[in-house]
Structure formats: C-alpha cells, structure tokens
Design a protein with these regions (language model features):
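Short proline/glycine- and polar residue-rich coil/turn motifs
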Residues: 366-376, 384-386
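PAPS-dependent sulfotransferase catalytic core
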Residues: 1-92, 116-117, 122-125, 129-131, 223-284, ...
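Noncatalytic modules at the cell exterior or secretory-pathway interfaces
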Residues: 82-83, 382-400
Length: 415
C-alpha cells in the first residue's frame, strides 16, 4: 500500500470527468491516419529519441507542445493537424490526441534514471531557474537526496517516485475510470498492461538496438547515427551558461533504502520492458533468418559488448549504483577475437571506477592470448571502496586485438 500519508483521488465535483482510455493495441507499420506519440520519461535518452523520430514528419506535422499538461487547452481541430507528438506526459495527458495512436517510449534502469534526473535539476543555474520560473526545480535543487526521497513530499516531487509506473499507468492519483487507485498494486498492473500494448519500447542502455527495433516495428527508416543529446554528465561542458558543477549526493544506508523504495515498482516495469524488447528483437532476427528460434538474443543482463581495435567500452554495474564501503570481487566473462587475428603485443585493460569516472579503484591488464576465441573465460578483478560509491562502472579498453566480447552480466560479491 502507498500508505495513509498519500491521498489518492480528488474531491467529487471539484473537477470535470477525468476518465481516460488505456493504451489500445495498434500493431503493424505506421499508417497515414496514425499519430505517433513519443512518451518522454525524463532522463531516458528522450531528447535523442525526439531528434531521431521528428524528422520522419514534415515540420508542420510536428506538434510544438512538449508538455502534456498543455494539451487539454488545445481544441481537437488544432491537435488533428499534427502527426507526431513528443511529450513529457502521462497516458492520461495524451488522451485528447485524436485518431489512432502509436505510442513509443524508452525505459531506463530506474535508480540510474532517478539519480540522473535529480542531478540534472541540481545542475541548473539559479538565474536560469529565475528566468524560466522553474520553482519546482528550485525546490528540488536545494533538497538533499535523502530528504527528496522521504515519503512525505510526494505531492510536490512526484517525479522521484516510480516515474515509469506513473506515466505508463496513466496518472498518479486516478485510474482510467476517474476514481482513485485502490493501491499501488493496481497502479503497477495498469502500467504493465499498457506497456504490453506499446507500439515500440526502447531500452536506454541499448540505443543502437532500440532505434533499430523501433524503426522495424513502425516500418520507417532508422535515422539513429550514434548521437547522445542532453546527457547529464556532459551538460555543464555543453551548455555552461545554463548548468553549473554540483557535488555528488552522499549515499548512506538510509538514502540507499529510500532510493530502493522510490523505484521498486519501476524495477518491475523495467524488467518487463527488457523482456518484451528481447522477445521482439528475437522475433525480428528470426524473421530475417539471422538466428534459429532456440538461440537467445543478446539483450539480457548477459548481453555482449563487442569492442574493436583501440576501442573503449563501459559496462555499468546496474543496479549497483550505490555500493557500501568494503572489498569486492567482480567476475567478468571475456572472449577474444580469432587467434589468427590476435597480435602478441595486444592488450586488454579492465578498470573499476565510480563517480562518473572520477575515481579509479582497480586496474588490471590481460594478455589476449590467454582468452578463448570460442567461449567466455571468467576474469576476476578485486577492488576496495574506502567510502560508499555511486555510479560504479567496469571499463574495458582494447589495443592490438581484432575484437573482444564482454558479457554485460557481472558477478559481484562483497568479500
């Protein structure tokens, strides 16, 4: 249960009918009568997705509204002019869009999404907040993470409580019938049901495959070129007049517990979204004759990251974004390129870092010749955290090697 401190629903008669429709199945290619709606959940690669999807439509068919709260104030005839909508919105907010809709969204590991969202708001300069009247962001900017995640301020900071679930269910406070949700389980069930009927779902951690899958589901060209826009870690360098440096939020046990509670429903949504994504990708590959049906595709926690000569790659531990102090043993699984393509002077470097690569905790070099080119070999790396650390990553760097495959599944244990 959400608890007595959170009041669902609104007073009878205070507002007009707020019932809305759940997502209706609309499979198949994008048709001329369809409206493509991109449901932009903050910090899920949504800005990138907008710039990939919008060029498929003439400029006068792209709705200029970016926030769903504004749609109810537009007449149906005006909304009917547009075929592409890219909105920070819940499903209830997009209900006024006329005609059949194909809804697309991206999902991101919930803890990482929440922390990125929090840090994005904290990095906004005060003068920008003043100029753009972003008082809700000012409130969050000056809140410690532990305070932000306490149960009581949900009414003022709903973006930091299971946001994927909220957006996909339709509304935080009311069910499609217009009544209050009975409990958080009903809210989650609605979100999962709507997720099943999405025209396409992308996973933030796998952008290339996500945009490929979306393009194939909608039967449109794939315009993704590797761009990454509005990335929290880079915004200060990209737009220094708008963003400033911020101190990383401390992560103690109580904060980690609150972070876990604030994302527990979203983890269910994210896991189901990854499963749907994997299944759709598998079907697409089978139809192309690329893999037999019994071979699992590589979009799971054990997904491969393949690096070529002089390439680098990061493997986010996820969901181990906030690890307590202590000594750890991480096990990776590596497979080297074909022996005939390997150079004896080649090298593989594995390191463990945290805080957006600011702290290096361990470095290990591996000779490519000790690795099999047919199966994955386990490689252990020990590291110690003197203090609790967030955004812990393992990085692999390759030199003098045709290719290296790294399984994204990392076994981690405290020793």
């Amino acid at each position: 249960m959400l608890g007595a401190k959170i009041r669902f629903g609104r007073a009878p008669g205070l507002l007009p009918d707020f019932s809305y429709s759940p997502v209706l199945p609309n499979p198949g290619p994008l048709r001329p009568e369809d409206r493509l709606v991109f449901l932009h959940v903050e910090k899920t690669a949504g800005t990138t997705a907008h710039h990939v999807l919008a060029p498929h439509f003439p400029e006068d068919q792209v709705c200029p509204v970016r926030f769903g709260l504004h749609l109810p104030f537009w007449e149906n005839a005006r909304l009917a002019r547009y075929r592409f909508f890219s909105l920070h919105a819940s499903l209830r907010m997009i209900d006024p869009i006329p005609g059949p809709k194909k809804i697309v969204t991206f999902l991101r590991e919930p803890v990482e999404r929440l922390l990125s969202h929090y840090n994005f708001w904290r990095s906004l300069r005060e003068e920008v907040i003043d100029e753009e009247h972003l008082d809700h962001i000012r409130y969050v900017k000056h809140l410690a993470l532990k305070e932000l995640l306490s149960p009581t301020p949900l009414a003022t900071t709903p973006d930091f409580w299971n946001l994927h679930t909220q957006r996909l269910a339709g509304d935080l406070f009311m069910a499609p019938s217009g009544r209050a949700w009975r409990d958080e389980h009903e809210l989650l069930d609605a979100a999962l049901a709507n997720l099943e009927n999405m025209a396409a779902v992308g996973i933030t951690e796998y952008p290339e495959l996500s945009f490929q899958r979306i393009a194939e589901d909608l039967d449109i060209p794939n315009r993704y070129d590797g761009m990454r826009l509005n990335v929290t870690a880079n915004i200060r360098e990209d737009e220094p007049h708008r963003f400033e440096r911020f101190e990383e939020a401390p992560m103690d046990d109580e904060t980690a517990e609150r972070l876990d509670r604030a994302t527990r429903l979203d983890r269910r949504v994210y896991d189901r979204g990854k499963s749907l994504f994997r299944d759709r990708l598998r079907v697409g590959l089978v139809l192309k004759g690329m893999v037999p049906p019994h071979v699992p595709t590589a979009i799971e926690d054990g997904c491969e990251l393949v690096l070529g000569h002089h390439q680098e790659g990061n493997i986010l531990f996820g969901p181990y974004c906030a690890l307590p102090a202590g000594s750890y043993l991480a096990t990776l699984w590596l497979r080297a390129g074909a022996a005939s393509n390997r150079k004896r002077e080649g090298s593989i470097t594995i390191d463990v870092c945290s805080g957006g690569s600011q702290k290096i905790h361990a470095v290990q070099s591996i000779r490519p010749l000790i690795l099999s080119d047919q199966w994955f070999d386990p490689v252990d790396i020990h590291f110690t955290l003197a203090d609790p650390a967030s955004l812990v990553e393992i990085r692999a760097t390759v030199a003098g090697l045709a290719n290296l495959a790294v399984k994204r599944g990392v076994a981690l244990r405290l020793i």
